[in-house]
């Protein structure tokens, strides 16, 4: 009988502890129009970007230390990349060997065909430079 009481007490304490836990974030973590999000971690900082229906400037860029509190720090591109004309969407960030890469989709100025472009930066905050476009 005493074992039953101990098990009941342990169960109650476990349930009370589980109920006391609080969420550390509340959705949305980044408010506003930002579909197709991508998040990377560089050292102890997180960076996020995504598609924005507000088309320009292109791709809002956010920073956070804890994945809860985000602050917009700029855009991947302040000016439209020279080879593009419209339909900027679905950027992806990658960080490798001290460089940050942003792959993104846009329509080519000459014929309106969608392509994937790539830009690089020495740090996640930018500035980002599009790699040279060639017709090859």
Show which residues each predicted segment covers.
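Bacterial Sec-dependent N-terminal signal peptides
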Residues: 1-22
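Beta-strand initiation motifs
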Residues: 22-25, 68-72, 124-131
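Beta-strand-rich domains and repeat architectures in extracellular enzymes and scaffolds
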Residues: 29-56
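Beta-propeller domains
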Residues: 50-73
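Short, solvent-exposed loop/turn segments at conserved positions within beta-propeller repeat blades
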Residues: 54-57, 109-114
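Beta-propeller blade signature
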Residues: 64, 117-123
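Blade-loop segments of beta-propeller domains
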Residues: 71-106
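Conserved small/polar residues in nucleotide/adenosyl-binding loops
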Residues: 133-136
């Amino acid at each position: 009988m005493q074992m039953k009481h101990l098990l009941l007490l342990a169960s109650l304490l476990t349930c009370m502890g589980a109920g006391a836990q609080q969420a550390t974030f509340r959705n949305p973590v980044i408010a506003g129009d930002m579909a197709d999000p991508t998040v990377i971690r560089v050292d102890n900082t997180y960076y996020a970007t995504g598609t924005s229906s507000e088309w320009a400037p292109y791709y809002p860029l956010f920073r956070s230390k804890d994945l809860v509190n985000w602050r917009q720090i700029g855009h991947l591109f302040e000016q439209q990349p020279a080879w593009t004309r419209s339909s900027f969407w679905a950027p992806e960030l990658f960080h490798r060997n001290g460089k940050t890469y942003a792959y993104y989709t846009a329509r080519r100025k000459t014929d309106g065909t969608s392509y994937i472009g790539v830009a690089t930066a020495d740090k996640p905050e930018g500035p980002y430079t599009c790699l040279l476009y060639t017709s090859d």
